[in-house]
Amino acid sequence: METMMLAALPLLFLSSCFPAFVVAQGPADPRLTGTWTTKSMKVFTGSAFYDPIKDRLKEPLLTGISYSFTADGFYEEAYFRAISNPTRPECPSGIMQFQHGTYRVEPNGSMILTPFDSDGRQLISNRCAGKYAEYTRYTQKEVFQRYEILIDSYNRVERLNMFQFDGSPLNPMYLAFRQPQMHPTHTLNPTHTTKGAPRATAISERKVNAKRAKRSEEKAAEFGFAQSPLSKNSFVKRMNYYHSRMEKLSGTDKLWWVGLIMTSVGSLALIYR
């Protein structure tokens, strides 16, 4: 017994020197393996969408959705969506979301995606709301009622149809890479908490809050789109309908004002004739 315990000590020491890796739970579907993206073909998972070192989301040229899956039960997702504003068409909003974690396929055909808690990120951007976008942590477990993989009759490539928990479909995605384009399948930005640590005093709390505020300002300056929160080369293309509508409206307004002024000038000329 003592010999076995001594033999196990080096293994315990080595295991403490390396970070813990997550093992995917539940069955995976090898047919899902790869990177899938929607029709715009501009949104892909991986380093092109999220930089974990700088903790920064990178805005693609066009909106879209991308999912990647591995054969051993890991996934990653990238969302870039435009949201119209019916009351102010010139002020559309944009949402970017990044998550990764594990997935499993249930016996009934449903699929459950469980993200790593500390890694999800969300960016909400509104050109009319302020100087900077809102950048926060984001964690949302997803349940898909079912999914199907088939050959698209038009593009002749593999297509992935995913149906949300209520049966509503996501936009169809097409296989872009058989080798998944994604980050390492473990937590990228862990949050460290110490149990039993003494509570900070009021002074130290103020110092921490001041440092956090300074970091937030630095992060906003670096990442918060010092220029317009929504770039012209993505949302303007996506929201052409609303922009053209506003342009037509402004042109009509101008024409109306010009007509009113000319009518007024003509009336005055007749009066003083």
From Swiss-Prot:
Residues 25-250 are lumenal. Its main location: endoplasmic reticulum. The chain crosses the membrane at residues 251-271. It comes from the Eukaryota. GO terms for cellular component: endoplasmic reticulum membrane. GO terms for molecular function: unfolded protein binding. GO terms for biological process: 'de novo' protein folding. Residues 1-24 form the signal peptide. This is Protein ROT1. It comes from Ajellomyces capsulatus (strain NAm1 / WU24). The lineage of its organism: Eukaryota, Fungi, Dikarya, Ascomycota, Pezizomycotina. The gene is ROT1.
